Amino acid sequence: MMSLADGTRPMLKVVADQHGNPTSTTAVARQLRNILAKPDLVGTFHLTCEGEATWFEFAQEIFRLAGKTQAVSPCTTDEFPRPAPRPKNSRLDKMMLRLAGLPPMPDWHDALAEFMKSEFNS
């Protein structure tokens, strides 16, 4: 997203009908440490940040944190064709984390702010 906000596009269209859980690799790594500290745990653990967002909402937050004034307009998946189909809902349930008594994943806003600060000093 940051490379798209280079000032050459007056308006960016970003998909607003696909929902997911934006997640940083740092948040995943921290939770993996918690899981690995409990060798008796078995099963599939979904490691996604708390909260949900569309790609449009995610882009808006990225630009806000970066102090960019890039104009962003929502569009539909049909208006933004991709080589492979994308799911409308890629949200994952973190029930296994709760059942294992592990700490929750951070909210995606907080994880994104941490990433932006470390990568872009924003």
Please give the residue ranges for each predicted region.
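NAD(P)-dependent short-chain dehydrogenase/reductase
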Residues: M1-G20, T26-A27, R33
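Residue-level signal for alpha-helix termini/capping positions
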Residues: A5-G7, L36-D40, F120
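Hydrophobic residues at beta-strand termini and immediately following loops
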Residues: V14-V15, L47, C75, W108
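Short glycine- and hydrophobic/aromatic-rich loop-to-beta-strand nucleating segment
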Residues: N21-T23, S90-R91
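Non-catalytic, hydrophobic alpha-helical segments
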Residues: V28, L32, L47, F58, ...
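Mid/C-terminal beta-alpha module of Rossmann-like enzyme folds, strongest
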Residues: Q31, K38-A84, K88, M116
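C-terminal amphipathic/interface module of NAD(P)-dependent oxidoreductases
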Residues: A53, K88-S122
